Amino acid sequence: MSKGLYDIPSWATTETRTLAKLAGVERLFEPQYMALQAGVEKGENLVVAAPTGSGKTFIALVAIVNSLARAGGRAFYLVPLKSVAYEKYTSFSILSRMGLKLKISVGDFREGPPEAPVVIATYEKFDSLLRVSPSLARNVSVLIVDEIHSVSDPKRGPILESIVSRMLASAGEAQLVGLSATVPNAGEIAEWIGGKIVESSWRPVPLREYVFKEYKLYSPTGGLREVPRVYGLYDLDLAAEAIEDGGQALVFTYSRRRAVTLAKRAAKRLGRRLSSREARVYSAEASRAEGAPRSVAEELASLIAAGIAYHHAGLPPSLRKTVEEAFRAGAVKVVYSTPTLAAGVNLPARRVVIDSYYRYEAGFREPIRVAEYKQMAGRAGRPGLDEFGEAIIVAERLDRPEDLISGYIRAPPERVESRLAGLRGLRHFILGIVAPEGEVSIGSIEKVSGLTLYSLQRGLPRETIARAVEDLSAWGLVEVKGWRIAATSLGREVAAVYLDPESVPVFREEVKHLSFDNEFDILYLISTMPDMVRLPATRREEERLLEAILDASPRMLSSVDWLGPEEMAAVKTAVVLKLWIDEASEDTIYGEWGVHTGDLLNMVSTAEWIASGLSRIAPYLGLNSKVSHILSVIARRIKHGVKPELLQLVEIPGVGRVRARILFEAGYRSIEDLATARAEDLMRLPLIGPSTARQILEFLGRVDEAREAEAREMLARKGLLSYLEGDAVAGEEGE
């Protein structure tokens, strides 16, 4: 037995052995072996606390295949982010080779659970599924919670805690498995879910950690080493040293702007050394990325060609994917990123550099948490490629290296603590208990509340629960009937569309001041909702935003009491949404307001969900059907980013906002207009190639014509069509 590696035990189940064979796993990592010993195959609840890259995903797969074989039912794998969901979907494809259908569920909160035995979902989506399908909890045989330490996140924590508590309270006997790389109080989390601990510090690639100051690397063991000063810029010299040794570097920095600036500087200095044919292939892919402002796509393409890239949440998914693939392939040697990458996709590097241990928000700065440092440092070391990984935290001029060593390298991550105490989280939690059942006793609410992490750590928050129930009652979402609480029709609808309960009083107040005949008013309403992702407005933008209000909705200035930072952020969000539904391009929106495509797509997705949800609850607030219809249409326009006349066309698969406008301007203004369109005519239009023409014709039920048109186009591309047609004519003449 090599250190940390174990043979698959003879007592492992057939399902585990089959999975290992298909996955190419010949020997088990230490945490994997420990999980088998702890009973992961037998349905034991577990908390697995082990470093990044130590095989936690395989443990999850073992739990899934054994649980489904043993008990049937369904398996859910929960993640905090959509990007992680898509990454896991790819790595879980092995399940299809075991006859298990896999689905991903991250979107519409109104949809029920997908029909598949294995589902990957975000926390929020699974929470909504429990509300839409109350019986689901009893049919889940295993629930895997990735990043279970997220229970201490202010935003997602209450949602995750609510999910686990309701699963513990359900009549079913689902196996619960929590996974984390940073959970120092794993024992307490295990006690919460009634499970065992699998705790290991073993890594497939050993980690070396240092503090960098004045071109010296300080080790926790007391070692000291000089870093060659080649470029006189520490990020370049630290990256270049790793590259020289056959590695790659991942540099985490505190802002998007700095990530871009450093990447450009690195490309100028290192580009000639790092450029390669493979890098140019990925560069070409980046330049063709869909949905990205041309300036951003071209900028990133030029950097990738030089073997350098940057990565942040503002990039569209297509560009983020290209950067990630180029880095994994080794075509890009250095990526400058914001810390969001550390919490998202798995992208390891030989050397990780933490450019600053501060974060900057609203003009203030504060040190990052130890858990955040550990998350970034955990990306160091590529399994199968590196003998070791290095994590380097950069000291400031007045820092003492030993303080950073004790404060970050040697320090344990912060305890995982419940965030359920806030009224907002508790209101959401309680409505999620009451609405699916229709009516419950206060004792039932206290029973589920007693199964929360908060209750374990601090006791049952009876006073806060009472205040939360009072709010829900005052807003018309529940009725208190002695010792029982019943959901109203409004409450059930709010729970079903998954809106924050506070949306109801906000909606009631805002409708007093707006006109539903004014699109900007409606978009401002959406932007004020508690769930909305708002765009912060800078001081320089405030004058332009006031002008926008005067142009779009002059009476808003008299109806809004105060335009502080939150209100200005809502105005900016409404302005950008108005541009979007008026078909402004991503380039225009980025150029005018500096909104990156990734942020725009996130905002659009949230706004569409809120608008749709408001359209559903409007009748329960006494608003007429016209209001519901207007909000429903606005929701569809936000989803597709179009003016009203294109709503029919964008429903056709493959026809987005740009192609829909092209079809409209060419005279195809409705489905009826397209019913008689010839494939050849469609393919002559800009951006309507054979594939899109085929999708249009198939949508119209003209399948044979679609296939024939695509075949003719392929022959034409190969230069065979004229030859075949000429041959056919010759044959006719011969007859």
UniProtKB/Swiss-Prot annotation:
Catalytic activity reported: Couples ATP hydrolysis with the unwinding of duplex DNA by translocating in the 3'-5' direction; ATP + H2O = ADP + phosphate + H(+)
Positions of transmembrane segments: none
GO terms assigned for molecular function: 3'-5' DNA helicase activity; ATP binding; ATP hydrolysis activity; DNA binding
GO biological process: DNA repair
Pfam family, one: Helicase_C
Placement of sequence motif DEAH box: 146-149
EC number: 5.6.2.4
List of residues binding ATP: 32, 50-57
UniProt xrefs under InterPro entries: AAA+_ATPase, DEAD/DEAH_box_helicase_dom, Hel308-like_dom4, Hel308_SKI2-like, Helicase_ATP-bd, Helicase_C-like, Helicase_Hel308, Hlx-hairpin-Hlx_DNA-bd_motif
Residue ranges constituting the Helicase C-terminal domain according to the UniProt record: 235-431
Highest taxon above the source species: Archaea
Keywords per UniProt: ATP-binding, DNA damage, DNA repair, DNA-binding, Helicase, Hydrolase, Isomerase, Nucleotide-binding
Domain Helicase ATP-binding stretches: 37-201
Gene3D superfamilies: 1.10.3380.30, 5' to 3' exonuclease, C-terminal subdomain, P-loop containing nucleotide triphosphate hydrolases
Signal sequence residues: none
Description of how the protein assembles with itself and partners: Monomer.
Chain's role: DNA-dependent ATPase and 3'-5' DNA helicase that may be involved in repair of stalled replication forks.
Record family assignment: Belongs to the helicase family. Hel308 subfamily.
Protein known as: ATP-dependent DNA helicase Hel308
Organism for this UniProt entry: Aeropyrum pernix (strain ATCC 700893 / DSM 11879 / JCM 9820 / NBRC 100138 / K1)
